[in-house]
Curated annotation (Swiss-Prot):
Chain spans, region G2: 60-64
GO CC, any one term: cytosol
G4: annotated span: 136-139
Top-rank taxon, per record: Bacteria
Residues spanning the membrane: none
EC number: 3.6.5.3
Quaternary structure note: Monomer.
Region (G3): 81-84
InterPro entries: EF-Tu_GTP-bd (IPR041709), EF-Tu_GTPase (IPR050055), EFTu-like_2 (IPR004161), EFTU_2 (IPR033720), G_TR_CS (IPR031157), P-loop_NTPase (IPR027417), Small_GTP-bd (IPR005225), T_Tr_GTP-bd_dom (IPR000795)
Protein name: Elongation factor Tu
Gene behind the chain: tuf
Domain tr-type G: 10-206
Organism placement in taxonomy: Bacteria, Pseudomonadati, Pseudomonadota, Gammaproteobacteria, Cardiobacteriales
Length: 396
């Protein structure tokens, strides 16, 4: 199969299906590709192709994920679907597949179930900004009042986790009927309506290059007669010669100025998101800056030591721990380019955490790290990854 050239004409948005097992996430994913293929000539994928998700490794964790693509009149969507609940948990926590918005699939026949709640909570914790609801299996419900009841329950659940439940678009349909080519209201038109809801309700994501400048520092050199150079890969934004910058994390925040940007030994007037660059700093001594700090636009990021996180603990099979850990556990937390020791505070009533579990915990680091909510990290013991996490809420 030849790969067509990736069309940049339409803006690119990342979405994914979430929801309880057997509520129809994969069937809906297949229906979305089919309906879009009929409208725009993109590729349709059937259920089995999507369900046979290949395993990927993200930060040393094995995750099964299916990636499909489809078009709307306005956009190009990249869509992730996971076969198992554990894959969702890992995917969302590691950020392996970042979502600009999620499609919550809930069976109209069953209403919200435990994983419906858990996926909404996870979406809140890992910073999925928007949720759109597809009430599936509407062909199995002939009672309009029951549909209304399920819709109300889903809205209440969204409100409970600080999503705007009352204003969330809810589309009622049957993914299976749409796949079968049904043109009644709950068939193909429902899928088209869902795509329109994605277009209308998920704002176009801000590109990394448009965000404020940030570069994790990987290395520091001193160049005689020119000053100190820090190197790293620009995470977001743009840095230009003459920009005032801050060095954040591990020690007191320091101010500096960029007097040069170089890439592959060539001087540039700027470095941007994705570039591996060296940034020459004026008035900063070699010993005043170290790996693990970040270089950033002043006032855009601050150092913190205490935060609430959502963590996935690797199973033994994934190369993680063989035994549980308890409160007071003190591993290394690896942020961007460096390890910092921290202590884990487990939630009330949780005595221990088993390999393969996911848990909400508070972490207290011994040194401050430049962070904002949504930052991913690894948990390590002696250089071996034993967990993955995301900063859900900064405490201090």
């Amino acid at each position: 199969m030849s790969k067509e050239k990736f069309e940049r004409a339409k803006p690119h948005v990342n979405v994914g299906t979430i929801g309880h097992v057997d509520h129809g996430k994969t069937t809906l994913t297949a229906a979305l590709t089919k309906v879009s293929a009929a409208r725009f000539g993109s590729a349709a994928q059937d259920y089995d192709q999507i369900d046979g998700a290949p395993e990927e490794r993200a930060r040393g964790i094995t995750i099964s994920t299916s990636h499909v693509e489809y078009e709307s009149p306005l956009r190009h969507y990249a869509h992730v679907d996971c076969p198992g609940h554990a894959d969702y948990v890992k995917n969302m926590i590691t950020g392996a597949a970042q979502m600009d918005g999620a499609i919550l699939v809930c069976s109209a026949a069953d209403g919200p179930m435990p994983q419906t709640r858990e996926h909404i909570l996870l979406s809140r914790q890992v910073g999925v900004p928007y949720i759109i609801v597809f009430l599936n299996k509407a062909d199995m419900v002939d009672d309009a009042e029951l549909l209304e009841l399920v819709e109300m329950e889903v809205r209440e659940l969204l409100n409970e986790y600080d999503f705007p439940g009352d204003d969330t678009p809810i589309v009622v349909g049957s993914a299976l009927k749409a796949l079968e080519g049904d043109t009644s209201e709950i068939g193909i038109p429902a899928i088209e309506k869902l795509v329109d809801a994605l277009d209308a309700s998920i704002p176009e994501p801000k590109r990394d290059i448009d965000k404020p400048f940030l570069m994790p520092i990987e290395d520091v050199f001193s160049i005689s007669g020119r000053g100190t150079v820090v190197t790293g890969r620009v995470e977001r934004g743009v840095v230009k010669v003459g920009d005032e910058l801050e060095i954040v994390g591990l020690r007191d925040t320091a101010k500096t100025t960029c007097t040069g940007v170089e890439m592959f030994r060539k001087l540039l007037d700027q470095g941007q998101a994705g570039d591996n660059v060296g940034v020459l700093l004026r008035g900063t001594k070699r010993e005043e800056v170290e790996r693990g700090q970040v270089l950033a636009k002043p006032g855009t990021i601050t150092p913190h030591t205490k935060f609430e996180s959502e963590v996935y603990v690797l199973s033994k099979e994934e190369g993680g721990r063989h035994t549980p850990f308890f409160k007071g556990y003190r591993p290394q937390f690896y942020f961007r380019t460096t390890d910092v020791t921290g202590e884990c505070v487990l939630p009330e009533g949780v005595e221990m955490v088993m390999p393969g579990d996911n848990v909400k915990m508070i972490v207290q680091l011994i040194h401050p790290i430049a962070m904002d909510e949504g930052l991913r990290f690894a948990i390590r013991e002696g250089g071996r990854t034993v967990g993955a996490g995301v900063v859900a809420k900064i405490i201090e």
